[in-house]
C-alpha cells in the first residue's frame, strides 16, 4: 500500500496472525499476496513494493524465530496485476530473505493455471529447490476468474501430471 497508515495496520494484523498460528500449534503461516499489486501500473512504484514485501517477510522472520512463511502466489483477482504471480516470484522472495530456509511456497493448481502455467511444472520447480511446503489441488477451465473446480474436474491429464510429480518427488 502507498499509505503508511495502511501498512502499519497490516503489520499489526500480521503479528496477530502469527500469534494465533503459534497459539494453535501451527508451524507455518500462509502469506497470500493476491492483494499486493495494482489495477493501474502508474499508481504504485513496483520496485518499492517489492522492497516492502521483502522487508515484511524479514520482519515476520524476526518476529517469530520458529515460524515458517509459505507464500501462495496468485496472478490476479482480486488485484488485476499481482506482484507475486508465480512460484518463481515467491521463491525469489524466499532466497532474498534473511532466512530462506523458513520461506517456502504453497501452490494452488488453479492459481498456476490462471498465470497460464502448468501446475505440475510449478510444483516440480519448487520441489527442485526443496521449497514446496504444501499444495491446494484443484482445477480451472481457462484463464478466467478463480473457479476452484474439483481436482481433475476440467483437465484430468493436468491433474494426473500433478499427482505424478508429487509421487515421484
Locate predicted features.
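Gly/Pro-rich active-site loop or hairpin
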Residues: 42-50, 80-88, 111-169
Amino acid at each position: 500500500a502507498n499509505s503508511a497508515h495502511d501498512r502499519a495496520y497490516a503489520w499489526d494484523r500480521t503479528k496477530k496472525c502469527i500469534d494465533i498460528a503459534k497459539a494453535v500449534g501451527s508451524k507455518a503461516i500462509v502469506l497470500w499476496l493476491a492483494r499486493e499489486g495494482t489495477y493501474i501500473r502508474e499508481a504504485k512504484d513496483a520496485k518499492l513494493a517489492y522492497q516492502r514485501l521483502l522487508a515484511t517477510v524479514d520482519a515476520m522472520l524476526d518476529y517469530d524465530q520458529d515460524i515458517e512463511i509459505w507464500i501462495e502466489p496468485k496472478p490476479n483477482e482480486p488485484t488485476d496485476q499481482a506482484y507475486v504471480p508465480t512460484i518463481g516470484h515467491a521463491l525469489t522472495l524466499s532466497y532474498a530473505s534473511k532466512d530462506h530456509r523458513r520461506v517456502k511456497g504453497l501452490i494452488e493448481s488453479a492459481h498456476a493455471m490462471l498465470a497460464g502455467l502448468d501446475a505440475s511444472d510449478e510444483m516440480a520447480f519448487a520441489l527442485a529447490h526443496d521449497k514446496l511446503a504444501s499444495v491446494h489441488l484443484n482445477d480451472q477451465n481457462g484463464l478466467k476468474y478463480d473457479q476452484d473446480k474439483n481436482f481433475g474436474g476440467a483437465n484430468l491429464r493436468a491433474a494426473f501430471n500433478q499427482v505424478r510429480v508429487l509421487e515421484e518427488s
